[in-house]
Design a protein with these regions (language model features):
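Walker A/P-loop NTP-binding motif of AAA+ ATPase domains
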Residues: 1-143
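Residue-level signature of catalytic and energy-coupling elements of molecular machines
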Residues: 10, 51, 72, 106, ...
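Generic recognition of well-ordered alpha-helical segments
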Residues: 35-38, 74, 122, 126, ...
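Activation segment
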Residues: 57-59, 97, 182, 213, ...
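Short, function-defining helix-loop hinge/capping sites that tune catalysis or transport
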Residues: 59-60, 98, 158, 215-219, ...
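Conserved C-terminal "switch" segment of AAA+ ATPases
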Residues: 85, 98, 112-177, 253-258, ...
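Active-site scaffold of zinc-dependent metalloenzymes
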Residues: 163, 176-196, 228-230
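Soluble catalytic regions of large protease machineries
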Residues: 200-206, 212-396
């Protein structure tokens, strides 16, 4: 996106342009930087374009005095009195020396952020406009299923889908090609579920359905893609949830299996539990959600957590884990039909798109406003109970 924006700018200006990219190393590259500035000065009015400038040097972040950056600074200073306009693209501006980024060398900084959902939909439509696509392409599903950080990433996926369709000797790109490409490119998923017993597949489907249902109830419309076509399966959440909700969603897979199979402990939940613990600890450390009793006030310079703080922290983390697990079970029990239908859909289709999920949700879940009210009411009482549990843990 950054290089594309710069190229469009240079094309619209209609001036002579000189581009510098790191295509060689050592002294040869440093010399090419000096030569590029000299050429731009000679051909003025001109634009000098430094592409991916943060990759000009291989020094670590603490060494910003690399000779490549010194050469750029010297070049900018040399063309100051000439009609040479210098622009650059960078991915990590923190890697550049402050002296290079200050006013007088680079006066304007323009942030180019990752595409929003609306941006991604427009970008996908643009790239597909020159390709033959089938009628089953659903733009909303396409946008929701992808994790996108740049235009180039979206373009790569769409080109790979076109190659896949051509390899299969199809006349057009279909939704199947898109789904298969996204699974492979972004999730590292094989296209066939490993041969497991029917019971194992059902438990995996139930586990992922638990995550999905909890996520959809806490944040309606947030799940854009989910599949069993990877070891353990996955659920792609399009929205960022608060840490407390993330912890509930993380434990909902375990809750779903243990509710369906009473007396059995769900296997393979270690990663989910670790994720929930991390969410709880982050909420306690960063925003003080668990109260000031978990803040280490003995020394603001202490490197390690004090023993007393560690005892208090672990007690509250365990209590919070229990609360989140119980909230997950409560959500799933109140949305049993939704959980059942999602599990069945997982077993049948293996991969669920946004439209599949929303179709099942609308048929099985009551109005989200009503759910939200019920949730707030029920969780208020649970929070009061937890406060007492925390106080008792701290007293102990």
């Amino acid at each position: 996106g950054k290089s594309l924006l710069a190229n469009c700018f240079m094309e619209e200006c209609g001036l002579n342009t000189v581009a510098v990219r790191r295509d060689k190393g050592g002294d040869a590259f440093i010399n090419s930087i000096a030569q590029a500035f000299a050429k731009a000065k000679k051909e003025a009015p001109a634009i000098l374009f430094l592409d991916d400038m943060d990759k000009f040097a291989n020094e670590d972040d603490s060494r910003c005095d690399a000779p490549e950056y010194v050469a750029v600074q010297a070049g900018i200073d040399d063309v100051k009195e000439s009609d040479v306009f210098v622009i650059a693209t960078v991915n990590e501006i923190r890697k550049l020396p402050d002296s290079l980024c200050r006013s007088g060398r680079f006066d304007r900084k323009i942030g180019v952020w990752a595409p929003t959902a609306a941006d991604a939909e427009a970008i996908i439509a643009h790239y597909l406009s020159g390709k033959r696509v089938s009628d089953d392409i659903n733009m909303k599903d396409l946008t929701k299923m992808m994790s996108y950080h740049s235009c180039a990433e979206l373009e790569t996926i769409l080109n790979e889908a076109a190659i896949r369709a051509a390899f299969a000797r199809k006349d057009s790109i279909g939704m199947e090609d898109m789904v298969g490409t996204v699974l492979k490119q972004q999730y590292g998923a094989s296209e066939d579920v490993p041969l497991n017993s029917e019971g194992a597949v059902k438990k995996t489907a139930l586990h992922e359905a638990g995550h999905l249902v909890a996520c959809e109830i806490l944040s309606p419309g947030s799940v854009g893609f989910a599949s069993l076509l990877r070891c353990g399966g996955f659920v792609h959440n399009c929205n960022v949830l608060p840490n407390s909700c993330e912890a509930i969603v993380a434990l909902a897979g375990k809750a779903a299996v243990e509710m369906q199979y009473p007396g059995q402990l769900a296997e393979g939940c270690g990663r989910d539990i670790k994720r929930a613990v991390n969410c709880i600890r982050e909420a306690a450390a960063n925003v003080g959600k668990m109260g000031f009793s978990l803040l280490d006030v003995e020394s603001d310079r202490s490197v390690c957590m004090s023993e007393s703080l560690n005892v208090r922290s672990e007690a509250v983390v365990q209590a919070e884990l229990e609360r989140c697990y119980n909230r997950a079970k409560s959500i799933l029990s109140r949305n049993e039909l939704f959980l059942e239908k999602i599990t069945e859909a997982f077993i049948e289709k293996k991969t669920l798109l946004y439209s599949n999920i929303q179709r099942i949700r609308s048929a099985t879940v009551k109005d989200s406003t009503e759910i939200a009210q019920e949730t707030v009411s029920q969780y208020h009482n649970e929070d009061e109970d937890l406060d007492e549990a925390r106080k008792e843990s701290i007293r102990r």
